[in-house]
C-alpha cells in the first residue's frame, strides 16, 4: 500500500526506534517532504484518521523515485522475480503515480500483471475530483471485480435476476475486452465478509450460523 507508511517506520520514526532521524523527529530528514504535516510534529494527516498510518504525498519527487525510480522498490522486487502487483485502494493514488509505477513494472517485465483494488465500476470511477483513467491503457491491466461479487451474492439471497444481469452486463459493456478477460473475480476477500457468512444471514438465538 503506497498511500501511507507506518508511524513506527524508518521513514516517519515517531517512537525513535531508528535513532534520531525520520520525518517526525527531523525536518531535515530526506523523508520529511513525503508527509502532510498540519503542525509538526504531532499534527499530521493520516489514513482514515489512524495516527499510526501517516499519509504520504505520492507526487513528491523523492517518494516517486524511491518507489518507481531506476533503483526503486518496484524494480527491485521485479528483479527478484515478482510477476505482478496488486495496488490497494487504487482510487487514493494519483494518476501520475500509478502511471509511473506501471512504467517501472513494464520496463522490467512487459508481461507482468498490474491489478487495482477498485470497489465500483472502474470505467467511470471518480476521485480526486476527476474521472479516473484506470482502464485507458496507461495504468491497470485489470481490477478487482467487486461489482460481480455483489451481483452474485445478492442474487443468491433473493435479488431479482434482472437486476443481477444488469449489473453484470454493465461491466461487460463498460470494460475493454482485454480487461474483461483477466478480471479478478472473487466472492470473498480479506476486506469483506466470507461468502458463507453473507449467505447464512445473522445468527439466531445466540446460535452460530452452522
Walk through the language-model features, giving the residues of each:
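Substrate-binding/active-site clefts of carbohydrate-active enzymes
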Residues: 1-79, 107, 124
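Active-site-proximal substrate-binding groove within the catalytic cores of carbohydrate-active enzymes
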Residues: 159, 169-210
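Short, structured coil/loop segments at alpha-helix boundaries
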Residues: 9, 60-63, 71, 145, ...
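Active-site-proximal helices and loops of the catalytic beta/alpha 8
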Residues: 2-19, 73-75, 82-183
Amino acid at each position: 500500500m503506497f498511500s501511507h507508511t507506518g508511524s513506527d517506520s524508518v521513514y516517519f520514526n515517531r517512537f525513535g526506534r531508528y535513532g534520531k532521524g525520520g520525518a517526525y523527529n527531523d525536518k531535515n530528514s530526506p523523508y520529511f517532504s513525503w508527509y502532510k504535516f498540519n503542525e509538526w510534529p504531532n499534527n499530521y494527516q493520516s489514513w482514515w484518521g489512524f495516527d499510526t498510518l501517516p499519509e504520504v504525498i505520492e507526487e513528491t519527487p523523492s517518494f516517486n523515485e524511491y518507489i518507481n525510480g531506476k533503483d526503486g522498490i518496484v524494480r527491485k522486487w521485479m528483479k527478484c522475480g515478482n510477476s505482478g502487483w496488486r495496488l490497494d485502494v487504487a482510487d487514493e493514488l494519483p494518476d501520475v503515480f500509478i502511471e509511473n509505477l506501471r512504467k517501472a513494472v513494464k520496463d522490467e517485465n512487459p508481461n507482468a500483471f498490474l491489478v487495482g483494488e477498485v470497489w465500483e465500476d472502474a470505467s467511470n470511477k471518480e476521485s480526486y475530483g476527476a474521472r479516473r483513467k484506470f482502464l485507458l491503457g496507461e495504468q491497470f491491466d485489470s481490477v478487482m471485480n467487486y461489482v460481480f461479487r455483489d451481483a452474485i451474492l445478492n442474487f443468491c439471497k433473493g435479488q431479482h435476476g434482472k437486476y443481477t444481469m444488469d449489473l453484470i452486463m454493465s461491466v461487460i459493456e463498460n470494460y475493454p475486452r482485454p480487461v474483461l478477460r483477466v478480471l479478478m473475480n472473487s466472492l470473498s476477500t480479506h476486506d469483506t465478509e466470507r461468502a458463507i457468512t453473507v449467505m447464512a444471514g445473522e445468527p439466531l438465538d445466540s446460535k452460530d450460523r452452522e
